Amino acid sequence: MERNFVLSCCSTVDLPYAYMARRDIPVLFYHYVVGDQEYVDDMGRDPAALPRFYGFLKEGKLPQTSQVNVAAYLDFFEEQLKKGDLLHIAFTSGQSGSVHNAMTAGKLLQEKYPDKKIVVIDSLCSSSGYGLLVDTAADMRDSGATLEETAQWVLDNRNKVHHQFFSSDMTQFRRTGRVSGAAAMVATIMNICPIMRLDDKGAIKAYGKVRGKKKAVVTTVNAMEEHAQGGRDYDQKCFVCHSQCPEDARMLIDALEERFPKLKGKIRLCDIGTIIGSHSGPGTVAVFFMGDERPAMD
């Protein structure tokens, strides 16, 4: 299929690489480091990569992530420009400064190739919510929308992609300093699951806590009903992802399909990749959907 422009993104979309390849969406891969060894956030290309990563966490090793530098973006963008004009949707600035390097690279290449269109957009989205935004942009591209039309849709709708999630394992939150050791211990003893979402700047915010996974699922489903476009009649894209807890993800999907009948059999299930997993750790389950404008949160 001939397309009007190239649409690209980063590996933190937490969708399978094979799916992105089928959709003709080039991906810039993030990396993480354990000890003195660097590993790629490979999106399922190597079946051993994700178990190896979570094995590191189980051993108490702390993966280090870093921003993608300008040089890496220059190389990636220049390769894409061989195929046409470029729209790159970047990982949220609320969790990484990489988008600023992407924008710098875009400006440098715009000067080098003045006849090309190069647009870089901060997605304000993360994980498979970021994936949902990119996937919908690909639908527009494939339906014949121009780069400008697609970019404007992304800008208008990026803050309508809701990210609702909970975690039943506070270990990695403690290791990365997001919660204190005492708070993590109490949460574990009391079986407390923090309820979280992304704010309007694409940053993670905790806004509640419940005891037990079942209550966490109900709270998450209630939040989706409150914010989803159409309420219980929601019938747009819906992605669920998890970090090494498929049974919990299945429990959430079952509850979503019961509450939102038009989603039955249509929810895409994905793994949380190594970059997002470096911060969430195991035991996190999330749902992503289109809704009203995400609120600002202190």
Model-based region annotation:
Residues 2-4, 12-33, 37, 87, ...:
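Mixed-charge interfacial surface used for oligomerization/domain docking
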Residues 6-68, 72:
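N-terminal glycine-rich anion-binding loop in soluble enzyme alpha/beta folds
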Residues 60-68, 90-97, 124-125:
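Short coil/turn segments at secondary-structure boundaries
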Residues 64, 115-119:
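Ligand-binding "clamshell"
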Residues 72-99:
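N-terminal glycine-rich phosphate/adenylate-binding segment common to multiple enzyme folds
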